[in-house]
Each structure stands twice: as structure tokens, then as C-alpha cells.
Design a protein with these regions (language model features):
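Beta-strand acidic-aromatic groove motif in beta-rich domains, primarily in extracellular
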Residues: 66-69, 97-99
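Bacterial N-terminal signal peptides that target proteins for export
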Residues: 2-11
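Beta-strand cores of secreted/periplasmic/IMS beta-sandwich domains, seen most often
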Residues: 45-63, 83-92, 96
Length: 123
């Protein structure tokens, strides 16, 4: 005879155990990124993190710019003389680019410049 309350309790315990394991493996990582003349230094153009890490990008720039993290759909306006934070939990795995928004097309879509940073999220 199957006991659904016992099965439900076992599934809940397993789910909570999995969530705690994921939380224990997750890290908080911070990267200070400076945009100068429309570029990030070569040694900061590739960032590697693990799935479920909390990633904080601290942006500074020499000219006003809007940046967009593709795949997570996060956009920030960055102004000279300030640090602008872009924080997210790396839930999706894969390669995600951060690109500047340069303007709008006649149809209203925004245009992107060259990739500033690539973020690789590993399982």
C-alpha cells in the first residue's frame, strides 16, 4: 500500500536537501570593470562563474554608456565618476555577452556595439 503523505514528506526533504546543497556551493563574486574608450581591458573580458553564483559587476566608465547583459536582460546606464552595480544570480548556464547600446534604428530597436565582456556560467 502506497502512503502519499510519507511520499510527499520524502520528496519535500529531498527538495530541501538539494536546495541547501546548491546554496552551499554558490559563491558571491564581484568584478570591478572599467570601460575606457569603449573597451574593457583584455584581462577582464572573460568572466567564468558557476551556476547559482551571485555575480556582482561594478562598472565605471570614462564616457556615459548603457550596457546590456544578454540572456538575463539586465540593462544599466553608467556615468563617469560613479560605480554602477549589476547584480544577478547565475541561474542559466552558457555564454552571455555584455554589449553597449549605441542608439536606436528607425524602427525603434536598439543597436549594439562590440562585446565588452563575456560571462561563462558553468554547471
Amino acid at each position: 500500500m502506497c502512503s502519499f503523505p510519507r511520499l510527499r514528506a520524502s520528496m519535500l526533504a529531498l527538495s530541501l536537501s538539494s536546495a541547501l546543497t546548491i546554496a552551499a556551493d554558490a559563491a558571491e563574486v564581484t568584478y570591478a570593470l572599467t570601460i575606457a574608450n569603449g573597451r574593457v581591458p583584455d584581462n577582464m573580458r572573460l568572466i567564468r562563474v558557476k551556476q547559482n553564483d551571485v555575480v556582482k559587476l561594478e562598472w565605471s566608465t570614462d564616457k556615459p554608456i548603457t550596457v546590456h547583459l544578454h540572456g538575463y536582460d539586465i540593462e544599466r546606464e553608467i556615468k563617469p565618476g560613479t560605480i554602477t552595480e549589476m547584480t544577478f544570480t547565475a541561474r542559466a548556464t552558457g555564454r552571455f555577452t555584455v554589449e553597449p547600446h549605441l542608439g536606436r534604428t528607425p524602427s525603434g530597436a536598439h543597436t549594439h556595439g562590440d562585446t565588452l565582456v563575456t560571462i561563462e556560467v558553468y554547471p
